[in-house]
Amino acid sequence: MRALPIARSVSELRAVVDGWKAEGLRVGLVPTMGALHAGHLSLVRLALSKVDRVVASVFVNPTQFGPNEDFAAYPRDEAADAAKLGGAGAHLLYAPDVAGMYPPGFSTTITVSGVSSGLCGDLRPGHFQGVATVVAKLFLRVRPDVAVFGEKDYQQLLVLKRLVNDLDLAIEVIGAPIVRETDGLALSSRNAYLSAEQRALAPGLYRTLRRVGADILGGGRVDDCLAWGIDELKALGFGPVDYLDLRDGATLERLDDAPEGPGRLLCAAYLGKTRLIDNIGV
């Protein structure tokens, strides 16, 4: 297997990307925080189906973690990540350090209003500012034609689509379907935090989402279905349940009735100390 080239500085990154663009090649970007799994690699493969060259970034972004979150504990293994990305077909790994992304005196943040409110936006203050700012910097550095993000972080996906739209960036943002284990658990780097007992319980989140979604589409009152879902999650061992809500799939506005167009059922809940998120289309 070929060794995947790694760029650490902006100048190294741009030297490679400028060369590709001089040849008329289309470039894709897959931003990640590392600790890669099959879900991340599916993003690379989707990007490869759209462009000629793919840059994958690995950067554990401190500005999107809250003071009591898991920045220090977040798993890091660059060598393993590089091997996986190379095997998936990526052409370049961009791996800046914190000083390279946020040099001394850095004082700019980007706020995307509207879709960043509610859900994780309310429960993780500053999170989407950190996401929007770092992704905007990655966009400016890589200048991709296409960027691919997973639908598991659905609110994040809509925040970044709004960012690109509002700032007139010539980038196509593509959402990739959630990749799941055979028992339904959405793949996540944080699944590594689960004990064996918790891992056995974790698929209950997806099962509950599916049941709630089916009940809503079957004519159940939305509030009653959501309340049942929260109670069911608690009975399964989850808690606290940060939210279980039905939203418009394009705007994330709360829906009180079954959606007439694409809707999204979103949930965030703790299993022990691990916060799991998931969502399904309704």
Curated annotation (Swiss-Prot):
<protein>
    <recommendedName>
        <fullName>Pantothenate synthetase</fullName>
        <ecNumber>6.3.2.1</ecNumber>
    </recommendedName>
</protein>
<feature type="binding site">
    <location>
        <begin position="150"/>
        <end position="153"/>
    </location>
    <ligand>
        <name>ATP</name>
    </ligand>
</feature>
<dbReference type="InterPro" id="IPR004821">
    <property type="entry name" value="Cyt_trans-like"/>
</dbReference>
<comment type="function">
    <text>Catalyzes the condensation of pantoate with beta-alanine in an ATP-dependent reaction via a pantoyl-adenylate intermediate.</text>
</comment>
<feature type="binding site">
    <location>
        <position position="64"/>
    </location>
    <ligand>
        <name>beta-alanine</name>
    </ligand>
</feature>
<dbReference type="InterPro" id="IPR042176">
    <property type="entry name" value="Pantoate_ligase_C"/>
</dbReference>
<feature type="binding site">
    <location>
        <position position="179"/>
    </location>
    <ligand>
        <name>ATP</name>
    </ligand>
</feature>
<keyword id="KW-0436">Ligase</keyword>
<feature type="binding site">
    <location>
        <position position="156"/>
    </location>
    <ligand>
        <name>(R)-pantoate</name>
    </ligand>
</feature>
<keyword id="KW-0067">ATP-binding</keyword>
<comment type="subunit">
    <text>Homodimer.</text>
</comment>
<dbReference type="GO" id="GO:0005524">
    <property type="term" value="F:ATP binding"/>
</dbReference>
<dbReference type="Pfam" id="PF02569">
    <property type="entry name" value="Pantoate_ligase"/>
</dbReference>
<dbReference type="GO" id="GO:0005829">
    <property type="term" value="C:cytosol"/>
</dbReference>
<keyword id="KW-0566">Pantothenate biosynthesis</keyword>
<feature type="binding site">
    <location>
        <begin position="33"/>
        <end position="40"/>
    </location>
    <ligand>
        <name>ATP</name>
    </ligand>
</feature>
<comment type="pathway">
    <text>Cofactor biosynthesis; (R)-pantothenate biosynthesis; (R)-pantothenate from (R)-pantoate and beta-alanine: step 1/1.</text>
</comment>
<keyword id="KW-0963">Cytoplasm</keyword>
<dbReference type="InterPro" id="IPR014729">
    <property type="entry name" value="Rossmann-like_a/b/a_fold"/>
</dbReference>
<feature type="active site" description="Proton donor">
    <location>
        <position position="40"/>
    </location>
</feature>
<dbReference type="GO" id="GO:0015940">
    <property type="term" value="P:pantothenate biosynthetic process"/>
</dbReference>
<feature type="binding site">
    <location>
        <position position="64"/>
    </location>
    <ligand>
        <name>(R)-pantoate</name>
    </ligand>
</feature>
<feature type="binding site">
    <location>
        <begin position="187"/>
        <end position="190"/>
    </location>
    <ligand>
        <name>ATP</name>
    </ligand>
</feature>
<keyword id="KW-0547">Nucleotide-binding</keyword>
<dbReference type="GO" id="GO:0004592">
    <property type="term" value="F:pantoate-beta-alanine ligase activity"/>
</dbReference>
<comment type="similarity">
    <text>Belongs to the pantothenate synthetase family.</text>
</comment>
<dbReference type="InterPro" id="IPR003721">
    <property type="entry name" value="Pantoate_ligase"/>
</dbReference>
